[in-house]
C-alpha cells in the first residue's frame, strides 16, 4: 500500500485497527490508531517523531503515544467503528 492511499483510508475511517508486519521481527502486530490530531488529549502528548517519505505519523490509542508506521508493511486496516458495531467498512 502506498503512503497516499494509506493516509486516505485511515483518514476516512477515523480510528482504525492497523495490522502490520514488524520490520525488526517479521511478526504481525497491530495498533489502534488515528491521523486526527485535533483532540485536546492528543495535542497534549509530546512528539519528537517526524514523518518522512516512507513513514506516516499516527497517534496510537492502545500505546497512548505517537508512532511512525511504514505503509508498505501494513497488511490490513479495519475501522474501529466496525468492531464497535457502529459501522461496517473494511479495507
Language-model segment annotations:
Residues 1-5, 52, 77-90:
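Ribonuclease/tRNase effector modules and their secretory precursors
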Residues 36-67:
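Acidic, aromatic-enriched beta-alpha/helix-loop junctions
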Residues 8-13, 51:
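Short, 15-30-residue, compositionally biased linear elements
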Residues 12-22:
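A short, Trp-centered hydrophobic/proline-enriched beta-strand micro-motif
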Residues 15, 90-91:
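Intrinsically disordered, low-complexity regulatory segments
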Residues 38-40, 64-83:
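Structured surface patches comprising rigid loops and adjacent beta-strands/short helices at the edges
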Amino acid at each position: 500500500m502506498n503512503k497516499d492511499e494509506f493516509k486516505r483510508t485511515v483518514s476516512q475511517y477515523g480510528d482504525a485497527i492497523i495490522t502490520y508486519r514488524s520490520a525488526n521481527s517479521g511478526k504481525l502486530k497491530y495498533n489502534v490508531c488515528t491521523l486526527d490530531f485535533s483532540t485536546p488529549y492528543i495535542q497534549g502528548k509530546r512528539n519528537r517523531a517526524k514523518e518522512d517519505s516512507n513513514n506516516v505519523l499516527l497517534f496510537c490509542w492502545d500505546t497512548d503515544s505517537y508512532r511512525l508506521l511504514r505503509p508498505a508493511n501494513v497488511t490490513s486496516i479495519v475501522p474501529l467503528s466496525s468492531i464497535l458495531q457502529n459501522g461496517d467498512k473494511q479495507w
